[in-house]
UniProtKB/Swiss-Prot annotation:
GO MF term set: rRNA binding; structural constituent of ribosome
Name of the protein in its database record: Large ribosomal subunit protein uL16c
Gene this chain is encoded by: rpl16
Keywords for this protein: Chloroplast, Plastid, Ribonucleoprotein, Ribosomal protein
Family that this chain belongs to: Belongs to the universal ribosomal protein uL16 family.
PANTHER family from the UniProt entry: 50S/60S RIBOSOMAL PROTEIN L16, LARGE RIBOSOMAL SUBUNIT PROTEIN UL16M
Gene3D superfamilies in alphabetical order: Ribosomal protein L10e/L16
One cellular component term from this protein's GO annotations in UniProt: ribosome
Subcellular location: Plastid, Chloroplast
Pfam annotation, one family: Ribosomal_L16
GO terms of biological process kind: translation
Length: 135
């Protein structure tokens, strides 16, 4: 699963996801891509599940690029803990995704194989996403 090797700070504020993605919203590497249509936090487990599904479906052909990286730590308090006594410990990592962001790219395969593989990866995501073709 993806996570940063080291960060400057162990914990982060939650922040808010407003607006659309101005960076990472164009196809750069492959010919086909999966584009987010809603804002969400996508966990490293979800990213990995989508990547595995695409790889398995494409068999040996083609190349896959993951265009998002989970660099935000999410902290969780232990169950049945009283209020106060600080913020919880980091539990898992998420990628902050805004509408328009490219999640995965694919190249070196035919369109129907790419469409099938990317639609399976889209079903693993917690958001609505669309299949797009470069050019």
């Amino acid at each position: 699963m993806l996570s940063p090797k080291r960060t400057r700070f162990r914990k982060q504020h939650r922040g808010r996801m407003k607006g659309i993605s101005y960076r990472g919203n164009a196809i750069c590497f492959g010919k086909y891509a999966l584009q987010a249509l809603e804002p969400a936090w996508i966990t490293s487990r979800q990213i990995e599940a989508g990547r595995r599904a695409m790889t398995r479906n494409a068999r040996r052909g083609g190349k896959i690029w993951v265009r998002i990286f989970p660099d935000k730590p999410v902290t969780v308090r232990p169950a049945e803990t009283r209020m106060g006594s600080g913020k919880g410990s980091p539990e898992y990592w998420v990628a902050v995704v805004k509408p328009g962001r490219i999640l995965y790219e694919m190249g070196g395969v035919t369109e129907n194989i790419a469409r099938r593989a990317i639609s399976i990866a889209a079903s693993k995501m917690p958001i609505r996403a669309q299949f797009i073709i470069s050019g």
